[in-house]
């Protein structure tokens, strides 16, 4: 094992050994560095790395370690209102509305994973509605349609997100809360509120590596300010245009499944409204409520590139004729 282990290597070693001293010996680092690294990894991914036995390291744990421990504990159990970050150079992959369904792996999802490997993004953002929640919707079941169990949906969401995690490498993993995602906690909080804060009562528990919140701001208060949020600022046929116009910054949203980029320019420069479409198939079983009517939707996702702190025009990967296309080539 190299002296400078990656996060994945550290997690694998800790999971196997579960003893700080043995982990430190295998990695060739001090015991204090091992514990500080553990807390840093827990805070970064919102996970808990358990310790075997009853060893107590509080006597020597650094102040930094204590702060990281507290941060990990908080992040593992809560959503953030705003997620703020900066990016000077690199790629951000943004997809939304996967509505992952048991037994279905879409062309768009496979393309998302392939481009995550090819482009080595700095960030991967799932912009809401990874979960569908068909059986726990406030809307009535349509006739006798077959709907998957919640546990099967959750398992599928975990499988698909794990595929993205493996493909994304060292990229930061972020997801925003969509209205379908909220169905999970809404259903539980309204019916079994006494179980609040117990393990398994939030989607955070099932996707621990993903930082989660309502909105993401990149390069806030700069000319390349980019906001990513599930819902558009304004709906309708001109939603992406109105969203960047009213937000005053480049604005990426999901929810409407259209997949389009709308530029807008004024005295402050050029900015963009982006609808990230859907990772699902537009006529998939998740959308039976459309009653087989035509939908102005498209399967695909967005790719945003920053160079020298400047945001370039967002690009789209679109599924057409059964294949995913990006920059004129099949993915």
Predicted regions and their residues:
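Short Lys/Arg-enriched helix C-cap and helix-to-coil transition segments
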Residues: 43-74
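Core catalytic region of metal-dependent phosphoesterases/phosphodiesterases
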Residues: 80, 95, 100-207
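Active-site-proximal loop/helix segment associated with metal-binding centers of metalloenzymes
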Residues: 192-222, 256, 274-283
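Short, amphipathic alpha-helical "recognition" segments used to contact nucleic acids or chromatin
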Residues: 2-19
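Mobile, glycine- and charge-enriched loop segments
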Residues: 66-106, 221
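Short, basic interhelical loop/turn and adjoining N-cap
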Residues: 21, 25-42
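Polar, enzyme-active/binding microenvironments
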Residues: 86-91, 118, 315-331
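Conserved beta-sheet core of the metallophosphoesterase superfamily
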Residues: 224-317
């Amino acid at each position: 094992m190299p002296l400078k282990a990656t996060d994945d290597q550290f997690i694998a070693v800790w999971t196997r050994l579960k003893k700080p001293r043995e982990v430190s010996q295998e990695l060739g680092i001090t015991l204090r560095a091992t514990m500080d690294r553990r807390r840093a990894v827990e805070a970064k991914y919102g996970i808990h790395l358990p310790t075997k036995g009853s060893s107590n390291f509080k006597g020597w744990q650094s102040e930094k370690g204590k702060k990281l421990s507290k941060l990990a504990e908080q992040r593992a159990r809560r959503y953030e209102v705003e997620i703020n970050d900066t990016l000077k150079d690199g790629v951000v992959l943004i997809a939304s509305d996967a509505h992952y369904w048991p037994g279905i792996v879409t062309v768009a999802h496979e393309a998302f994973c392939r481009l995550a490997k090819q482009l080595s993004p700095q960030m991967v953002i799932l912009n809401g509605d990874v979960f569908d929640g068909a059986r726990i919707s406030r809307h009535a079941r349509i006739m006798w349609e077959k709907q998957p169990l919640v546990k099967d949906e959750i398992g599928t969401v975990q499988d698909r997100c794990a595929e993205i995690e493996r493909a994304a490498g060292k990229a930061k993993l972020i997801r925003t809360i969509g209205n379908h995602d909220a169905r999970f906690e809404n259903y539980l909080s309204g019916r079994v509120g006494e179980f609040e804060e117990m393990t398994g009562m939030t989607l955070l528990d099932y996707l621990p590596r993903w930082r989660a919140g309502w909105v993401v701001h990149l390069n806030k208060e700069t000319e390349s300010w980019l906001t990513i949020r599930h819902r558009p600022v304004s709906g309708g046929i001109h939603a992406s245009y109105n969203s960047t116009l009213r937000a005053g910054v480049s604005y990426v949203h999901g929810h409407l499944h259209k997949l389009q980029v709308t530029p807008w320019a004024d005295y402050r420069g050029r900015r963009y409204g982006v609808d990230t479409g859907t990772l699902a198939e537009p006529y998939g079983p998740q959308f039976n409520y459309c009653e087989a009517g035509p939908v102005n939707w498209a399967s695909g996702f967005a790719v945003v590139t920053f160079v020298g702190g400047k945001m370039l025009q967002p690009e789209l990967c679109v599924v057409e004729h059964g294949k995913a296309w990006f920059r004129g080539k099949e993915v």
